[in-house]
A protein has these predicted regions:
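Acidic-and-aromatic substrate-binding clefts and catalytic sites of carbohydrate-active enzymes
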Residues: 66-70
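Bacterial N-terminal signal peptides
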Residues: 2-13
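Serine-esterase "nucleophile elbow" of acetyl-processing enzymes
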Residues: 16-65, 75-83
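Alpha-helical cap/lid subdomain in secreted, periplasmic
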Residues: 45, 52-55, 71-209
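Compositionally biased regions
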Residues: 14-17, 119
Length: 209
């Protein structure tokens, strides 16, 4: 009987060790995969890129098209239902497009990061930039939100989610805002080293090689 119990414990331990890392892509249409076939969105492309690196991960799509930082803060508890170890926070683009007060955007993101911190989750904050037609005062205040919050919360920052893609017609859909499949590939390729570094930090904390 004792031997059977030991075997069950070993099997349970092995199953737990084999469970894929849970990564939550918490954002707006840029993470939701707006306008793209399911296989071409940010989430499946990131999961595929991680698999190519030999990393077993389940990337969970918590992107809601049109969402603002206020909407993200309101639905955060629900989005964490799968208990992710790593959360990629990609919100703020719609705040900028609507010209919302950067102080409000910063406060909402601060609330999101504080809750994730309190739950001991690894965080990768993806930065966003305001549309350049909103004026220097607005864009300066908005663009500073992400590095300021990353420093305050001591979390990893990917400076600009659309780095290498924004304003390039070859990498965007007809609306000029949302990346096409090729654009998403660029986004994932640029962000991947940051995701890998975050995963390495999780493994070190857990005592894994």
């Amino acid at each position: 009987m004792a031997a059977a119990g030991l075997l069950l414990a070993l099997l349970t331990s092995s199953a737990s060790a084999a469970e894929p890392l849970r990564i939550l892509a918490f954002g707006d249409s840029l993470t939701a995969g707006f306008g793209l076939p399911d296989a071409d969105g940010f989430v499946p492309q990131l999961q595929s890129a991680l698999a190519d690196k030999g990393i077993a991960a389940r990337v969970i799509n918590a992107g809601v098209s049109g969402d603002t930082t206020a909407g993200g803060l309101a639905r955060l508890d629900w989005a964490l239902g799968d208990d992710p170890q790593l959360v990629i926070v990609e919100l703020g683009a719609n705040d900028g497009l609507r010209g919302l007060d950067p102080r409000t955007t910063a406060a909402n993101l601060d609330g999101i990061l504080a809750k994730l911190e309190s739950q001991k989750r690894a965080i990768l904050l993806a930065g966003m930039k305001a549309p350049r037609n909103l004026g220097t005062e607005y864009t300066t205040a908005f663009d500073a939100i992400y590095p300021d919050l990353a420093a305050r919360h001591n979390v990893m920052l990917y400076p600009f989610f659309l780095d290498g893609v924004a304003t390039d017609p070859q990498l965007n859909q007809e609306d000029g805002i949302h990346p096409n499949a090729a654009g998403v590939k660029v986004v994932v390729g640029h962000m991947l080293p940051y995701v890998l570094k975050a995963i390495d930090g999780i493994n070190r904390t857990a005592g894994q090689p």
